[in-house]
Amino acid sequence: MAVWTLGINHTTAPLDLRGRFAFALDQVEPTLRALRGSLSRQPEAALISTCNRTEIYCAGEKPELEHTLDWLAQTGGVSSSLLRTHSYTLQDDLAARHAFRVASGLDSMVLGETQILGQIKNAVRAAEAAGALGNTLSQLFQRSFAVAKEVRSSTEIGAHSISMAAAAVRLAGQLFEDLGQVKILFVGAGEMIELCATHFAAKSPKAIAIANRSLENGEKLASRFGAEVMRLADLPDRLHEFDAVVSCTASTLPIIGLGAVERALKRRKRRPMFMVDLAVPRDIEIEVKALEDVYLYTVDDLASVVQTAQASRQAAVAQAEAIVDAGVLSFMHWVDQRGSVPLIQQLNAQADEWRAAELARARKLLAKGEDVEAVLEALSKGLTQKMLHGAMTELRASDTAARERASAAIQHFFLRKER
């Protein structure tokens, strides 16, 4: 059984390319079905898609890395050569090591972050719902969860880390002298916006508003922070009211355009605006960054901020890598053992066939009134003869080399002393 991974992340691909391969959670199931349908052997498959990475994990009799890459490139509307330049492909132990490192937060933009674990669990549930998760990938991900748990409980990998949400607050604090006088607009109502709202609310801003396509979801989040709720459609007309805008939606197209921001700046009389776009693909048109009075940051721009505390945690990283290595060895041992399962099943089936035949014969003899001891003796001899027939045949082979190999194997399997 082979395991393989194909992916792009924040270190290998720019934001706009990652945006072409971003899949919302409700898109994962149909995407997995399409992927498996495009491959010749219908492998097990799972798809992880976050703002920082898109990764496909597969397991099957033979790896189909090139076909997987070609399919993903076509899905994203780019050439295979371009995707190959910005992606990574891993097999077997390297694929397992990567999965364990990702789950443990070792491969994240924010070293040791825990959000990725929930995202992987969502991906596993989606793979199960799509009928794409088999024994091998199930083991891979369950073991990745166990490794991640041990890493977080046994090391200080997450100590002093700065989340994306905290980084956004830190940058806002550099622009505005007093966040208590700032009006903040959050666009979206997902997990990332909830985290950002929590961090900003701790600074007691002057006002908080939440714009969302679904008013119901927006109201649920707004109730936690005493925030105003507004329709997404009203955003262009009210954008000028806010000093800071943090956006993270699942939209496939930008929802805040250059024209809307220019009009907002004009109505603000050029007072600066702080904007954070945490969405992949982008929520805010990239051209907005060129405006003189706008300070726009993307997920990639926040990288230098969130990584400031990582150097002091290298000892924890080394400990975590050792835990990952142990997990990889254990998983690969399990995979190797799985290769013997068909033979074990065949051996058990053959033994059951012999047992059933001898048992049926014994029952017939007992029904005829034969002596019980004689029947049991015949039963045991019959089973013994059937089990040893193949070995005896090999020992009588005319080929000397074959006899020697058979002799060594038989001594190993049949003549071991009881311990």
From Swiss-Prot:
Residues where substrate binds: 50-53, 108, 113-115, 119
UniProt record, GO biological process: protoporphyrinogen IX biosynthetic process from glutamate
Site label Important for activity, positions: 98
Keyword Oxidoreductase listed: yes
Origin superkingdom: Bacteria
Active site, per annotation: 51
Protein's job: Catalyzes the NADPH-dependent reduction of glutamyl-tRNA(Glu) to glutamate 1-semialdehyde (GSA).
Other facts noted in the record for this chain: During catalysis, the active site Cys acts as a nucleophile attacking the alpha-carbonyl group of tRNA-bound glutamate with the formation of a thioester intermediate between enzyme and glutamate, and the concomitant release of tRNA(Glu). The thioester intermediate is finally reduced by direct hydride transfer from NADPH, to form the product GSA.
Protein name listed in UniProt: Glutamyl-tRNA reductase
Native organism taxonomy: Bacteria, Pseudomonadati, Pseudomonadota, Betaproteobacteria, Burkholderiales
Gene this protein is translated from: hemA
